[in-house]
Amino acid sequence: MTSAAELDDYARQVKLRGWRGVFPSDQMPDDIRPGDCLIANYSPLHDGVRNGTHWVALAFPRGAHARYFDSMGRGPEVWDGTLGVDSPFKTYLRRHSFAPKGMPHRYSWNRVQWQSRQTEVCGEWCLLWLMSGCDTTRDPWPGFSRVNFAKNDARVRAMIGLRAGPSPHRPPSVGSAG
C-alpha cells in the first residue's frame, strides 16, 4: 500500500488545488472550507493496523454537494465487509457539504469499480481522481476498462509513478499542518 507520506508528497508536488492532506478516518479535519480535498484511510489512528487498510478521496467543491471516491466503487455509507470496518465517511460528508441553500446537504460518489481487488494502488487512484476534477456523475476516464482491472491498475500506477507495496509509514503519519 502506498504510504501517507508518498501520497501527501505527490499531491504537494503537483500543487493539487485545495489540498488538505492525508488522514486516518478518525482524524479528518473539522475545519473544511469550500474547495478543499483530502485522502483518508479507512483505518482509524489507533486500530493497530500498521499500514492502514484502504485509501479513499473526499472533495468539497464550492456551491456543490460533497464528493467521495472509492476505487472499488463502494459508497461512503456502507459497512465494509471486505475490510471489516465501519465507514465514518457518510456523516463527515453530510456535515461538510457546501450545497447551495435549498438543496439538502448531501454527497455523491462513484459507483464504478476501477481497481482490482488483488492490487494495492487505491492511493494512486485517489490522486488521479482528485487531479481529474473529482467528478462522480460521469466516466472520468473513458480510456479505462470496466472489466480489466489489472490493466487499469498498471496504467494508473504508470501515470502516477508511485510504488505500491508494503510501507513503513502509518496512514496518520502525515497531516495537513504546515
Residue ranges, per PLM feature:
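Cysteine protease catalytic domains with a Cys-His-Asp triad
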Residues: 1-57, 61-66
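Cysteine-nucleophile protease catalytic domains, especially the papain-like/related folds used
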Residues: 1-21, 116-134, 146-162
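Acidic-enriched, low-complexity/disordered segments with a strong bias for Aspartate over Glutamate
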Residues: 8-9, 26, 30-31, 36, ...
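Intrinsically disordered, low-complexity segments enriched in small/polar residues
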Residues: 16-19, 73, 173-176
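Intrinsic-disorder/low-complexity coil detector
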Residues: 23, 28, 60, 75, ...
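Cysteine protease-like catalytic core of ubiquitin/ubiquitin-like
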Residues: 39-135
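Catalytic-core signature of thiol
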Residues: 104-114, 131-178
